[in-house]
Regions:
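The feature captures the LRR N-terminal capping module
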Residues: 1-196, 200-218, 227-228, 241, ...
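A contiguous binding-surface segment within folded domains or other stable secondary-structure elements
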Residues: 215, 226-251
């Protein structure tokens, strides 16, 4: 009987100790959970605070929802921004933004993506999901590479990539952008006009000033709808005669190149209203050929007079 009682006593003690140890372990675990819970709560509060800040920057204009951030510190955009996926335009300037988030693909109704004057280094391939996007403005950034997926943005009408400095090529797939009307690639490192531009059927305005162009493609005339072509401050030495086949061209800027002559075929470009040949080492001296204003601008009247003088000079030399 005593043995049975002793055994029961040991069993009871063991149970008590096990219960006590379990409680100690639970208390220890609870103490460990509390800091984590506080961290989670802090994260939730921070996300709500950030989302509230972003919501304050959303406004309605012309029937569209715009997100406008200007001169604030947003080097990265938070994931909670997807809660505002109904926004149709992003206007984010001078924030130090370094990256376009991959969740941009969730903004399926986005019409304008304007991230000018930031520090963006690349365009994510997810950009191709934005089939409603009409304007992509990334001037004054650090973009070096354009993904071919941009060619899937079938509604794109305006593309601005000026002053990214080291950008020197565009993917061929961009020729699929059949609604693209305006392209600004000025102040970059292009050595040639990207072939995809020659195959864009709607292109009307192209600025490639301040690049490293040494020549123009012979088939430049394929840009049949082009109205304005800006090629100032390049390294061009000649203009191909095929430019005369660009029947809709009304503005041609060639100032600050290395041109020694003006192609005679340009005399027949009846739609050409504005042309600038200023700061080129042209062969003929035209001191008295045009009035002071035209001499300053080296415009259309200067061009016509130059061609006529060149033709007359060639005839005199032949005789």
């Amino acid at each position: 009987m005593a043995a049975i009682l002793a055994s029961a006593s040991v069993s009871t003690m063991k149970t008590l100790w096990e219960t006590k140890i379990q409680k100690i372990q639970e208390n220890h675990n609870n103490q460990r959970r509390k800091p984590r819970s506080r961290l989670v709560a802090a994260d939730v509060w921070e996300e709500r605070h950030t989302l509230a800040r972003l919501r304050d920057k959303v406004k309605m204009q012309d029937g569209r929802l715009l997100l406008c951030l200007e001169q604030e510190d947003w080097k990265a955009l938070p994931g909670c921004l997807v809660r505002l996926s109904q926004v149709q335009e992003w206007h984010i300037h001078r924030t130090g933004l370094q990256k376009i988030p991959s969740f941009i693909s969730l903004f399926s109704n986005l019409l304008v993506l304007d991230l000018s004057r930031n520090g963006v280094t690349e365009i994510p391939k997810e950009i191709g999901s934005l089939t409603q996007l009409r304007e992509l403005l990334l001037s004054y950034n650090k973009v070096r590479f354009v993904p071919e997926e941009l060619g899937d943005c079938e509604s794109l009408e305006r593309l601005e990539l000026a002053i990214n400095r080291e950008l020197d090529r565009l993917p061929d797939k961009l020729s699929q952008l059949r609604r693209l009307v305006r392209v600004d690639l000025s102040m970059n490192a292009f050595g040639t006009i990207p072939p995809c531009l020659l195959r864009m059927p709607a292109l009307e305005w192209l600025d490639m000033g301040g690049n490293r162009l040494r020549s123009l493609p012979q088939d430049i005339y394929r840009m049949q709808k082009l109205r304005a072509l800006w090629l100032q401050r390049n390294l061009l030495e000649t203009v191909p005669e095929s430019v005369g086949r660009m029947s809709r061209l009304d503005t041609l800027v060639l100032s600050g190149n290395r041109l020694s002559d003006i192609p005679p075929v340009m005399e027949k470009m009846d739609n050409l209203r504005f042309v600038n040949f200023r700061d080129n080492p042209l062969t003929l001296e035209m001191a008295a050929a045009v009035d002071e204003e035209e001499r300053e601008m080296f415009g259309r009247e200067f061009m016509l007079t130059y061609i006529q003088e060149a033709r007359k000079r060639a005839l005199d030399e032949a005789n």
